[in-house]
Amino acid sequence: MVNSMPKPFLTPGTLYCGAAPAVISTVLGSCVAVCLIDRHNRAAGMNHFVLPHNPAGEDSLRYGDVALDRLHARMGELGCETKDLRAKVFGGAAVLPFGATGDSVGTKNVKIAIEWLHAQGIPTLARRTGGENGLLIRFYTATGRVLVRTIQSAITIDLGGISPAFDSRQSPFFQE
């Protein structure tokens, strides 16, 4: 039953993985969320990262290279094998200003996610990336379905019963 399952809300720089059914939610602008699911092991997870990588090498889930590796590792701890994983990628909107040359932060975030998944051999089943509007994402881990709602600028969002992020000491949620 959906009402009794965990409903973690991911803030930037967090991830959630588990084998029990959950509804994982987040709100994205230029940030990216990658959802991984292993139907064989009935495990799933999602991250929410802010920037593609940190040139200083900071070990933080706010950076895509770290967040993707950690999500993959956590899925492995749940018994998942890379060959059984499937991905869905969301976010990366051009909501932050950037110079006339080069890609936006959102574009760079999407690029690192897609390249990382390709390098791992993890198929991407769905993708809603880019654009100019934010997204509200709800990932139903039991089925792998994702509800995506477009967020227009300057609106208030009622998250309707979604719990705020868990304390970072609670498993299976990680926050830095």
From Swiss-Prot:
Its EC number is 3.5.1.44. Keywords: Chemotaxis, Hydrolase. GO terms for biological process: chemotaxis. It is an enzyme of class 3 (hydrolase). The keyword Hydrolase applies. GO terms for molecular function: protein-glutamine glutaminase activity. SUPFAM superfamilies: CNF1/YfiH-like putative cysteine hydrolases. It catalyses: L-glutaminyl-[protein] + H2O = L-glutamyl-[protein] + NH4(+). The keyword Ligase does not apply. HAMAP family: CheD (MF_01440). Probably deamidates glutamine residues to glutamate on methyl-accepting chemotaxis receptors (MCPs), playing an important role in chemotaxis. Belongs to the CheD family. This is Probable chemoreceptor glutamine deamidase CheD. It comes from Rhodospirillum rubrum (strain ATCC 11170 / ATH 1.1.1 / DSM 467 / LMG 4362 / NCIMB 8255 / S1).
